[in-house]
Amino acid sequence: FYGVRGSISVSGSRYTEFGGNTTCFRIMAVDSGRIGIVDAGTGIRQLGEDFLEELQEQSEMFIAFSHFHWDHIQGFPFFAPAYNKNLQINLLAKGGSKKIKDLKDIFATQMQETYFPVAMDNMGARFNFLLLDKNSQIFTPPDGIPVKITAMEHIHPGGAYSYRYERGGYAIVFATDIEHGETIKEDVVELAKNADILVHDGQYSKEERVH
């Protein structure tokens, strides 16, 4: 867990238990050491530093996005591996009722000269922009072990998606920035069924939500 905060990053001794970075998760395949990433909040900066320090021999990686609010993309320009010309980065999202027509534009816009000194096209890495057109899709990375990715839309202002990743008989589910309302959405329950790990948002207690 490289970032679990919402909205904005924070610093200070009072935040040491959970850290101060915004959303970013790393998934690592223990057999091959290959990594995948979910969301690119400020936590992705440290993830990138660790990736380089560990000298991982990986020429391709996936970064999946639950949605594109600032706290899920604001670390992307500071992801050091993205400046490696020998790396291919697949940026993945699910299209939906508000279908993203140009996934590249989301990242290129926040790196325009007005906002950031380096344009996306000058970062170095090769970028591949993938929009899931189905709820489930299977990808086969260079290690030859298929990864099934299932996306399920859940309640959040502007829309967001929970993801289920299945590989080698194991499953992990990420359901972040999720709001159930009075009842839990059955689709999300089904998505999480029999998962080995469920990562679920718990930003507000009932008492906090009142305020």
Regions picked out by a protein language model, each given a short descriptive name:
Residues 171, 179-211:
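Cap/insert and terminal regions of metallo-dependent hydrolase folds
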Residues 1-173:
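Binuclear metal-dependent hydrolase catalytic cores
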